[in-house]
Amino acid sequence: VIRSMRVHGKGSSKYDNVRLGMNSRLDTIQAAVLQVKLQAFKEYELEKVNEVAARYTEKLADCVKVPMVPEGYYSSWASYNILFQDEAQRDEVRAYLQENGIPTMIYYPKGLHQQKVFEHCDLYGEELPVTTSICKRTLAIPVSPYLKEEDQDKIIRLIREKTGANA
């Protein structure tokens, strides 16, 4: 099963994919770059991105639902997703951020139970109202160890303005 998964879910023949899989093998150059990048990640980026995320959490927790990492743990913060009251509020804030030059992403427009790759699963097509609601209310905002404090201040200010938290 592991061998199959590491080659895109390959079955007994080359084009017979029997499960979800991936190809995560690195060539020598990719491995060399990654070795240097991992050192920078350990020495600087992990701590710094957690500081950026903690600042978002502190400044936004009273106006949107923010992600929580248990005490004593770190996250690599591939994304920082905030949860709004409803889809309309999310879309309004997203448009406002984009008008002000702030990129955003909706990484989860629909739940896994709604994605074709899982149509063979028992939950495919089922109504999962909590999952569906979260997908409609979630927005990823910029997070990076290199995000400047003044840029983060602007993002925070714009979100607070549009959610009415500054009133």
Protein language model regions, located:
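PLP-dependent aminotransferase class I/II
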Residues: V1-A167
